[in-house]
């Protein structure tokens, strides 16, 4: 029965729509606060548990004594090879290199402590006699002061970190005159060719020596040829980081998308590019094998 006033009892009144929304908002806010407090509590407990785990430990329990790192004598300068390095070019001979296509002795030009690309039919790329897996590589290169051409036809070459075939097969760190020379960014000096541009452009003027210091982690493969772990490269150019542990997506290709092809160990290759510009030079090439 009614109250005689014609109004519903206060206890039976419905909340206005705004009131319902407000209550919902209030409940959600409280719920989020509870969640936040819960997460904070969990992390605090984890930190407390870790602290408890370390309670009573002695400093000696986290000391590692073996195996003892090998003693390596550094070079007299940062550019000089350390005592455990394999010198690939000592400024005197090409004893460590062969023609990448034929396996015959390399025919590039050696003089005044410098190795210069020799262009011409049947000469082509050169690669190391030795094969490598993971390593640290030092190489210096120079674009001629009188360089001509533009874009990719201006001092083009490359350091192939793993040569997987006789021509331009493999994984290339680009060499090019990129001092005021416009080209696609994943094709300029310091780029993993057609895969990743350099982080910065630290190129010096033509006629000045440039330096690459490279750490190469080779890809590994399963028995069926499928990829087990990808290749990684870290590279410094003239002391500046240009590739930061970049994960390659396959071999570097001029045309098409990169892909992996199974190999175990591979030579390091230097490219004799077919452009008509003046040939570039290299010096002071050494490598340290890594685990």
Question: Would you name each region that the model predicts?
Answer:
Residues 3-4, 41, 81:
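Residue-level detector of alpha-helix boundary/anchor positions
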Residues 49-291:
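Carbohydrate-interacting regions of secretory-pathway proteins
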Residues 13, 27, 32, 49-50, ...:
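Intrinsic low-complexity/disordered segments
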Residues 23-39:
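Bacterial N-terminal signal peptides that target proteins for export
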Residues 1-27, 231:
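N-terminal amphipathic/basic-hydrophobic helices that include classical n-h-c signal peptides
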Residues 7, 12-13, 31, 36, ...:
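Serine/threonine-rich, low-complexity intrinsically disordered segments
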């Amino acid at each position: 029965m009614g109250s005689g006033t014609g109004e519903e009892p206060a206890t039976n009144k419905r909340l206005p729509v705004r009131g319902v929304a407000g209550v919902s908002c209030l409940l959600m806010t409280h719920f989020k606060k509870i969640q936040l407090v819960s997460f904070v509590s969990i992390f605090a407990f984890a930190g407390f548990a870790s602290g408890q785990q370390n309670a009573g430990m002695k400093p000696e329990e986290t000391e590692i004594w073996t195996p003892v790192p090998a003693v390596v004598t550094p070079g007299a300068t940062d550019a000089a090879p350390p005592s455990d390095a394999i010198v690939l070019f000592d400024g005197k001979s090409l004893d460590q290199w062969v023609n990448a296509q034929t396996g015959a002795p390399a025919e590039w030009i050696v003089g005044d402590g410098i190795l210069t690309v020799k262009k011409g039919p049947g000469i082509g790329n050169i690669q190391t006699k030795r094969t490598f897996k993971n390593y640290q590589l030092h190489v210096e290169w120079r674009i001629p002061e009188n360089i001509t051409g533009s874009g990719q036809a201006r001092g083009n070459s490359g350091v192939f970190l793993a040569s997987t075939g006789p021509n331009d097969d493999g994984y290339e760190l680009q060499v090019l005159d990129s001092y005021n020379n416009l080209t696609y960014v994943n094709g300029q000096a310091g780029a993993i060719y057609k895969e990743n541009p350099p982080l910065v452009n630290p190129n010096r003027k033509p006629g000045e020596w440039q330096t690459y210091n490279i750490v190469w982690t080779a890809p590994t493969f399963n028995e069926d040829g499928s990829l087990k772990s990808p290749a990684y490269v870290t590279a410094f150019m003239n002391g500046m980081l240009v590739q930061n542990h970049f994960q390659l997506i396959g071999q570097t290709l001029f045309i098409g998308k990169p892909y992996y092809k199974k190999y175990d160990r591979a030579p390091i290759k230097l490219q004799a590019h077919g452009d008509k510009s003046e040939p570039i030079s290299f010096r002071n090439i050494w490598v340290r094998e890594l685990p």
